[in-house]
Amino acid sequence: MFERILVAVDGSTNSDRAVEAAAEMARTHGSTLSICHAFHIPEQYKTDLADELEEALESDAEKILTHAAGVAERAGVTARTVLLKKGHPTEAVIAYADELGVDLIVVGVRGKTPGQTRAMGSVSGAVTEQAGCSVLLVRGR
């Protein structure tokens, strides 16, 4: 049913739960699993410090993706990871899902990214409304 699954992560505990759920589904159904993390630097923050800010965000993002891949690996699934840096996270996740031709996007609800609160809540809601495929929302325990 779901041959290609994409899970969007933000480094939160709920994000880990989303990876666990996606990995379990992928393992059970023999699906491919991709994990993405998206960040965007708004124009008003593109100043002389933009390069340093982007480097810091990229470093954090790589740690988030490495951790998420480890969560999937512990669930018995090897996942492909990708960092999305262009556009708003919602748009980036949906565009990447379309590019991959995924059947299911999995997101945690009410996650957070550094410097933001409840970011994944807004992203998960927007992905649910705008995605061209099924979306699974995973709540924390």
For the regions a protein language model found, what residue spans apply to each?
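Small/aliphatic-rich secondary-structure junction motif
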Residues: 3-48, 71, 75-80
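Short, well-ordered secondary-structure micro-motifs
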Residues: 18, 45-48, 91-94, 117-118
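Glycine-rich, Arg-bearing micro-motifs that act as flexible, cationic patches
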Residues: 104-130
